[in-house]
């Protein structure tokens, strides 16, 4: 491995953590494992106990055990069949034998009886007696046993009761060290039960302060919820550092079929071909009754309505084959069924949807009015009110009443008709069809869902919206019913056998930012949340993993300043020394020295990444498998490498690479895990060391010369500063121009009135290929030129768009368009699509939208709650719009232009002007890549002109300087913005009227550096260094040789 030292980051002794220790997973000073936690000794004992009682524990059960043994409360996120109940009972018995009190709560008496029998069997297998150890209570036990139970209640080490007993007798129960709740929904139905659980754990409610006080004596383990949690459940997060989450998992393996026919004959045909296990969803209760009456004589079928629920049990027992109900989001058949063996397929008779009519306008919620405003934003009156729509709700209502009968907004995923708008209800469809495909310990059962709809316009809109959820419908003609039925049965056979022992394993998934962590967790359901030492962790079950998603908050270490040669031990091996990053929360200063207060402002309000490293270690130790999903570049690779080293001994560490934050991309990345690429890491190590060495050495020279410790020098920023200075000097030279406004002409002339002769020399039509999609430098240039954003602002906005899943990764020099990108473009462009790959194939891709959604679509779908994003402002939508238009234009047919070339004669001079006078085509409409001007009249004219003295050349804009950096090979996509921002930050340049002007300080610093250290900061040397970095990335150059050359060069600076 790459030699490295992490200063004071050994988890065992607190001293340095070195390469050999990382490789061996051992602290050499203490001779102990790097990932040994206090609970591990008890864990070993518990695992042996569990083997005796139950059998070999699953990986996820070991993770739960570690949490409980260190007294952490949590919601157990896991699919059916993993063994939550058996674990809860075995852990209770284990802790009871250690003298701890445990309470196990079930929703029904039957489950209490079963649990009591099971735990006795466990005790028997473990060879321990249960007399006076276990007490259980339910409504069916004789009165004398009940009395005996109540008398000995506080003496039992394990108490097993129903939720109802908790409600009535919690004061007699006493305190507990471990509470296991088998069905948290039963607890949450009565909110006071939450208070009672907290009391049992050692908290109490202070009437004076009106708040909960105390500390948890024990820990709580609950299942995830299926119903609404209610406000009381928030107390779990406040007091026990976890949030329950939902067991509604959106991982699905469903074959979705759309049929433009909702006749009874079509429905009957599906039921006949697929056999038993169908759920039929009707729009309304009346329609459900009609379907039932039509089918009851032909099929063994039942119906579930608000008043008829008896057929549900018959279906469970197999006495009937199919159930009919209504497609309502909170309905019994949509949310209340969890029968993986029985339910094989679903049929929706009619698309789930909700309608808004003109008559509804006055009664609509402000949120719904706002949503309709975004849908009808093409109406000028509404567009004008959108920026402050909340303050004009009543006015918008009146406008909507006028336009809903006339206007037809362009939205493929919504049906707009005269006087009504129909929104497809995908949420209900996903929940209902999800009953056919359930996650269990052995994987995911397969299901099928048929969507029958007569209204072709509504069906088309439904299919369009489904794409936003990665649901692709096929037609019924494409379905092989025999094969489908066999696959449905085979997956249920696997469920019944449950042969795969440990198919679903816990995994820690680390990304850079909290936004990205939240976004990823939302793709797969409503996560349970755990707060561990300040780190927020989102827990979600998937087909192969129970993922714990959390953020590293960028780099966790940086080069130290006070050891070796500016943070590098030079002993022939060049070993970088890294320390945790400290950041002052008050002034923002970042440092690596081991100190409690900020060296700049003295504040003790300092964030130390050490706490995150420790939390990640604990999580990695729990999961025993780590996936690092940091950004797909050298910086992301370096973060992954550091985490792999710092989490040494806690489990295998793999890298997930994805270029967009979408559900599809995350799933693909998790299927294609790889090792950390050390060549990319070496390149980053060399780049950072080079930046440190040249920066520190030359900065110290500047400090001495200018007596200003705020100054800095860098190899890349210095030539860029030189270009800005040179261009500024050139801009001082002036020239006279005559502006003829009537003809939109600018001529090199100094007369205010003169004769002008214009001749048409040539006229031609051309087909122009659209510009390629954005790379980092072209995006930065256009955002500065068109939107007037600084490069720093653009990169920040692009980062947030990427993390929210709206665009692909924004640090790239590739124009390549992937197959996915081309599919997105084809879907949006239709017949205008031609498709271009642009760049060479490879890992990186251009900057593009992740869905075929315009800016207006994105804003509307955010309002509707279909897209869940955070903190977007008008700037985000403006940049997204630019990226979207440029990308879609790049995939269009060539556009046609008409070019006219003119000869212009005036006062004995001749000038030529070629101008585009017309442009047409979809590509031009999307992105105006050419400047269209009016045709010039031909003939001789007496004209008046405005004479101005202007610079021969103008100072650079940020847009132009970025393009120049790209052309001259200075900087990389990840550093363009940093280089420019640093020039502003050091006050070497300022911006006036959008142009970069060097300050006197900037000019003096540049001249000093060029005069004394030209060879170190020259453009050629900087470009050569960039090419060497690229060679290291490709594995063509030894990074130690590069460091050796750099070191010799730096040491020659006097």
UniProtKB/Swiss-Prot annotation:
- The active site is formed by 809
Q: List the disulfide bonds.
A: 35-650
Q: How does activity depend on temperature?
A: Optimum temperature is 80 degrees Celsius for positive supercoiling. Optimum temperature is 80 degrees Celsius for relaxation of negative supercoils.
| Catalysed conversion reaction | ATP + H2O = ADP + phosphate + H(+)
- Helicase ATP-binding domain location is 65-245
Q: Which residues are involved in binding Mg(2+)?
A: 512, 631
Residues annotated for Zn(2+) 2 binding in this entry? 584, 587, 598, 601
Transmembrane ranges, per UniProt, are none
Q: Which NCBIfam families does the record cross-reference, listed alphabetically?
A: rgy (TIGR01054)
Question: What is said about its interaction partners and assembly?
Answer: Monomer.
Q: Can you name this protein?
A: Reverse gyrase
Q: Which gene encodes it?
A: rgy
């Amino acid at each position: 491995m790459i030699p490295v030292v992490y200063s004071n980051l050994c988890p065992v002794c607190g001293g340095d953590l070195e390469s050999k220790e990382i490789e061996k997973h051992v602290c050499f000073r203490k001779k102990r494992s790097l990932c040994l936690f206090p609970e591990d000794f008890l864990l070993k004992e518990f695992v042996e106990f569990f083997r005796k009682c139950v059998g070999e524990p699953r990986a996820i059960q070991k993770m739960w055990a570690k949490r409980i043994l260190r007294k952490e409360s949590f919601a157990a996120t896991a699919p059916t069949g993993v063994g939550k109940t058996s674990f809860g009972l075995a852990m209770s018995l284990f802790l009871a034998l250690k003298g701890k009190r445990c309470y196990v709560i079930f929703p029904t008496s039957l489950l209490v009886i079963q649990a009591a029998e099971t735990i006795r069997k466990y005790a028997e297998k473990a060879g321990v007696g249960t007399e006076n150890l276990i007490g259980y209570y339910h409504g069916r036990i004789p009165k004398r046993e009940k009395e005996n139970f109540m008398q000995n209640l506080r003496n039992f080490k394990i108490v097993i009761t129903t939720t109802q007993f908790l409600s009535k007798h919690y004061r007699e129960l006493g305190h507990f060290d471990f509470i296991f709740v088998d069905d948290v929904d039963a607890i949450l139905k009565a909110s006071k039960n939450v208070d009672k659980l907290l009391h049992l754990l050692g908290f109490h409610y202070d009437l004076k302060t009106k708040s909960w006080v105390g500390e948890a004596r024990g820990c709580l383990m609950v299942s995830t919820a299926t119903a609404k949690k209610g406000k009381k459940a928030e107390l779990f997060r406040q007091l026990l550092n976890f949030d329950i989450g939902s067991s509604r998992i959106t991982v699905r393996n469903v074959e979705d079929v759309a049929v433009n026919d909702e006749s009874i004959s079509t429905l009957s045909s599906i039921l006949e071909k697929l056999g038993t296990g169908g759920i039929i969803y009707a729009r309304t209760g009346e329609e459900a009754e009609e379907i039932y009456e039509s089918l009851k004589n032909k099929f063994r079928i039942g119906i579930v309505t608000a008043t008829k629920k008896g057929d549900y049990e018959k279906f469970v027992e197999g006495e009937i084959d199919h159930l009919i109900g209504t497609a309502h989001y909170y309905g019994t058949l949509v949310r209340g069924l969890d029968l993986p063996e029985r339910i094989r397929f679903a049929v929706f008779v009619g698309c789930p949807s909700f309608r808004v009519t003109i008559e509804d306008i006055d009664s609509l919620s402000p949120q719904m009015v706002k949503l309709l405003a975004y849908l009808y934003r093409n109406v000028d009156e509404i567009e004008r009110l959108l920026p402050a729509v909340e303050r004009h709700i009543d006015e918008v209502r009146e406008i909507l009443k006028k336009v809903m009968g006339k206007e037809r907004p362009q939205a493929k995923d919504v049906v707009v008709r005269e006087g009504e708008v129909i929104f497809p209800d995908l949420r209900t469809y996903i929940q209902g069809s999800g009953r056919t495909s359930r996650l269990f310990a052995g994987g995911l059962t397969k299901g099928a869902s048929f969507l029958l709809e007569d209204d072709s316009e509504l069906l088309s809109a439904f299919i369009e919206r489904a794409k936003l959820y990665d649901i692709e419908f096929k037609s019924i003609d494409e379905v092989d019913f025999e094969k489908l039925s066999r696959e449905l049965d085979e997956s249920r056979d696997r469920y019944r056998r449950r042969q795969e022992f440990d198919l679903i394993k816990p995994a820690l998934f680390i990304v850079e930012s909290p936004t990205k962590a939240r976004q990823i967790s939302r793709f797969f359901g409503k996560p349970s949340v755990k707060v561990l030492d300040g780190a927020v962790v989102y827990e979600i079950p998937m087909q192969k993993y129970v993922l714990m998603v959390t953020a590293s908050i960028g780099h966790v270490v940086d080069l130290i300043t006070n050891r070796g040669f500016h943070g590098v031990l030079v002993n022939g091996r060049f070993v970088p020394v890294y320390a945790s990053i400290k950041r002052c929360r008050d002034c923002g200063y970042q440092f690596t020295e081991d100190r409690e207060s900020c060296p700049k402002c003295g504040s003790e309000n300092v964030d130390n990444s050490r706490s995150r490293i420790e939390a990640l270690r604990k999580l990695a130790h729990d999961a025993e498998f780590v996936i690092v999903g940091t950004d797909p570049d050298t910086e992301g690779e370096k973060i992954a490498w550091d985490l792999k080293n710092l989490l040494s001994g806690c489990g295998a560490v793999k890298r997930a690479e994805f270029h967009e934050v979408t559900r599809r991309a995350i799933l693909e990345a998790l299927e294609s895990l790889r090792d950390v690429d050390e060549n990319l890491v070496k390149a980053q190590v060399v780049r950072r060391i080079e930046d440190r060495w040249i920066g520190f050495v030359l900065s110290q020279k500047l400090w001495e010369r200018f007596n200003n410790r705020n100054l800095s020098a860098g190899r890349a920023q210095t030539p860029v500063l030189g270009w800005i200075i040179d261009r500024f000097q050139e801009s001082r030279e002036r020239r006279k121009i005559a502006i003829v406004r009537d003809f939109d002409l600018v001529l090199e002339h100094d007369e205010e009135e003169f004769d002008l002769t214009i001749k048409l020399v040539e006229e031609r039509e051309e087909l122009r290929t659209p510009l390629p999609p954005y790379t980092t430098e072209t995006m930065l240039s256009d955002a500065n030129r068109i939107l007037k954003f600084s490069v720093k602002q653009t990169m920040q906005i692009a980062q947030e768009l990427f993390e929210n899943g709206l665009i692909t990764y924004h640090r790239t020099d590739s124009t390549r368009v992937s197959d996915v990108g081309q599919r997105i473009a084809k879907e949006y462009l239709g017949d205008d699509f031609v498709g271009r790959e642009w760049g060479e194939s490879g890992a990186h891709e251009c900057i593009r939208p992740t869905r075929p959604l315009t800016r207006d679509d994105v804003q509307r779908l955010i309002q509707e709650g279909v897209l869940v994003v955070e903190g977007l402002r008008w700037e985000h939508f403006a940049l997204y719009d630019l990226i979207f238009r440029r990308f879609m234009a790049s995939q269009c047919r060539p556009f046609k232009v008409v070019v006219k070339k003119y000869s212009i004669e005036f006062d004995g001079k001749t000038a030529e002007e070629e101008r585009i006078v017309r442009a047409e085509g979809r590509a031009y409409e999307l992105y105006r890549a050419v400047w269209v001007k009016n045709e010039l009249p031909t003939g001789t004219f007496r004209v008046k002109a405005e004479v101005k003295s202007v610079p021969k050349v103008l100072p650079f804009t940020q847009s132009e300087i970025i393009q120049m950096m790209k052309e001259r090979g200075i900087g990389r996509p990840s550093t363009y913005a940093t280089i420019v921002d640093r020039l502003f930050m050091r006050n070497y340049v300022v911006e006036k009227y959008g142009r970069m002007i060097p300050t006197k300080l900037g000019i003096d610093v540049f001249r000093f550096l060029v005069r004394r250290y030209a060879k170190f900061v020259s453009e050629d040397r900087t470009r050569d260094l960039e090419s060497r970095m690229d060679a290291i990335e490709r594995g063509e150059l030894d990074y130690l040789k590069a460091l050796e050359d750099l070191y010799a060069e730096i040491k020659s600076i006097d």
